[in-house]
Amino acid sequence: MEENSADIENRPVAAFRPAVSVPMPVLPQDGEVFVGPGGKKDAQKIGLGLSKLSSKRKDDIQMAKKYAMDISIKQILLRQQKQQQENQQRQQMYSQALSIMSRIYVGSISFEIREDMLRRAFDPFGPIKSINMSWDPATGHHKTFAFVEYEVPEAALLAQESMNGQMLGGRNLKVNSMMFQEMRLPQNMPQAQPIIDMVQKDAKKYFRVYVSSVHPDLSETDLKSVFEAFGEIVKCQLARAPTGRGHRGFGYLEFNNLTSQSEAIAGMNMFDLGGQYLRVGKCVTPPDALTYLQPASVSAIPASVSVACAAITAKVMAAEAAAGSSPKTPSESGGSRAASPAPRAQSPATPSSSLPTDIENKAVISSPKKEPEEIEVPPLPPSAPDVVKDEPMEIEEEEEYTIPEEKPKPVAIVPPPGLAIPSLVAPPGLIAPTEIGIVVPNPSFLAQQQQKIEEKIEEEEEARTERVKLSTSQRKKMKREKLNQMTFEEKMAQVLGQQKAVQNQRMADPVTFGALDDTVAWKDPSNEDQTSEDGKMLAIMGPGRGGDNVASMALALMDGGSSLMLANNAKAKEAAAALALEPKKKKKVKEGKKIQPKLNTAQALAAAAKAGEMSDALKNEVMNSEDASLASQEGLEIRGNDARHLLMTKLMRTNRSNVIVLRNMVTPQDIDEFLEGEIREECGKYGNVIDVVIANFASSGLVKIFVKYSDSMQVDRAKAALDGRFFGGNTVKAEAYDQILFDHADYTG
């Protein structure tokens, strides 16, 4: 042991081995470790190892949570209320814009037209909401214009297109729509036009057609079968009546392409369908626009329901806020640094725009000792004169080009156009490109340099102005100078001067003798062919015929000048009377252009054929119904000899009937082979029975028995005896039957 210790003491220090890194052994985990080694610091962050709260603290936390929830609910309720008010205001603006689109102006209305007549004229285009006619209390007439408001905008547009220029009461109507800016929208709705444009833009996304004046007996299926000849119909909808039975006479059809829409409008507008002319036009509103015109009634939400909804919304928003405030990854946090905008590469073609302002004003790159004569003035680009020549400019002749007195700016030499190759951005510093020379002149020679630059610029400007295209005003002025034209005042002054000179010259002329006028000169009454030259007489004539020279006026009065003046006055009066008596040309009243359906395509012809069949069916149904009015029977046609003979027999005074009908005598179950013999035997007691007919209507359960006698007197006796008689427990009803119907085997009467 001693030897070993001695060896250790005598061993040199440099003989130690180098340190070797040994990996840390992986030890098995013993116990719970949270977040990191030891888990003490990080455990406090997540709430581990904290002391338990007392009941009072827990109550305070619950009260704080409840208060925070109440505040959140109040904020959400206020936000919902504000949003609801904004939606109501937006809906009201939309409704007002649609109301403007549904209104038309009708002008040039005759005084004989009343409101009911105007309503009948404009009712076929759609449901009318109101008609506003202004009345003059002094005259008791309207002011020849009115405002018609429809319930849908399409009806207003269709009425404007169809009724503008049409004649009503002897005058051509002027119908304009209120949806355009030319009609001067109301001052309280200046923001309606953008909404109208938005509505019309949305309507172009759908290929919808508006149809009005639809027959009440037609259904959506019938209307769809007529219009499906133009193309596939996506939707067909007729406006329902408030009572729930039938429709209101207008509706909408939606096609799947624009061609079908256009052909349907051109082919079916003003087409006779069921006795009414269809009115077909394009739609200017989307399908959901009518909900704004007639909004549904909104019931008030209970307070408890609104509070519960707000509480749920607050919880959802709190969860979203907690999820949004989670810590980001390093890559996400570093993204903002990478997203910062990088400096743009400077283009050699535009050096002045890429330099900062402070560099332009303060940087001195060239030597300030350079002589002024060696300063290079930037030449004008070769394309500059052409650009100025092509653009018209307003240039006054008195205006001269002068350089504004400003602070000296750096002069940049623009290089020739070339290919701009982007390069890497250099580090920030006062480094200018090699092709740019920026010189800030020294104040000692600033005046000389500025003067030379101004002289050269003036020379270049003079050369440019020679090739500048003159403006319109300059060309007119040069033309006026060349043609020696003058202004209106100068022309008037010249004309007045010329007239004054002529008057002065005439006043200076001596009095001469001239021939009398034909109306005053004496003529021989016996010579009718005497001309005015043969019978000329001399009279004193002054320069103004007694109007200018006083002396000549006195001389003319003595020798018949007054007669000449009276004759001239008479001529003037006759001319004025002739002008007044000219008959005024009556204003031609042009009838409006009639709109006819364009049946120039195969689809239109097929739709017309289908509509014709439907119209005939409707007419026959109306004529054969019991509720047919006299107006519907005005166009009744009689076809065939039998129908004509039947009608003429009804109109003539016919003989009495020999047939009696017995009703409610037997039931269908009582009919057997012995019934006819029993009836013949019973009815034979009152006369000679010729024929007995038993008509059994199984569908209705009625049985009618017809008995034909040889004389009408026998019919009266049988009727008096059998009417009201009991037979098999039934009360028999006997009455005379039409002889013609019985002869034609018609037992339905």
From Swiss-Prot:
InterPro entries, alphabetized: Nucleotide-bd_a/b_plait_sf, PUF60-like, PUF60_regulator, PUF60_RRM1, PUF60_RRM2, RBD_domain_sf, RRM_dom, RRM_dom_euk
SMART domains documented for this protein: RRM (SM00360), RRM_1 (SM00361)
GO cellular component: nucleus; ribonucleoprotein complex
Domain of life: Eukaryota
Domain RRM, chain residue ranges per copy: 102-176, 207-285, 658-739
Places the protein is found: Nucleus
SUPFAM superfamilies cross-referenced by the UniProt entry: RNA-binding domain, RBD
Signal sequence region: none
Major localization class: nucleus
Low complexity compositional bias, start-end: 330-354
GO biological process: alternative mRNA splicing, via spliceosome; mRNA splice site recognition; regulation of alternative mRNA splicing, via spliceosome
Region annotated Disordered, chain positions: 323-388, 457-480
Family assignment from sequence similarity: Belongs to the RRM half pint family.
Keywords: DNA-binding, mRNA processing, mRNA splicing, Nucleus, Repressor, Ribonucleoprotein, RNA-binding, Transcription, Transcription regulation
Name by which UniProt lists this protein: Poly(U)-binding-splicing factor rnp-6
Function per UniProt: DNA- and RNA-binding protein, involved in several nuclear processes such as pre-mRNA splicing, apoptosis and transcription regulation. Ensures the correct splicing of genes involved in immunity to promote longevity in response to infection by pathogenic bacteria such as S.aureus.
Disruption phenotype: RNAi-mediated knockdown increases survival following infection by pathogenic bacteria S.aureus. RNAi-mediated knockdown impairs the splicing of genes such as prg-2 and tos-1 following infection by S.aureus. RNAi-mediated knockdown induces the expression of nlp-34, lys-3, irg-2, irg-1, M01G12.9, fmo-2 and cyp-37B1 under non-infected conditions. RNAi-mediated knockdown increases the phosphorylation of pmk-1.
GO molecular function: DNA binding; RNA binding
Domain observations: The third RNA recognition motif, called PUMP domain, is atypical and may rather mediate homodimerization and/or protein-protein interactions.
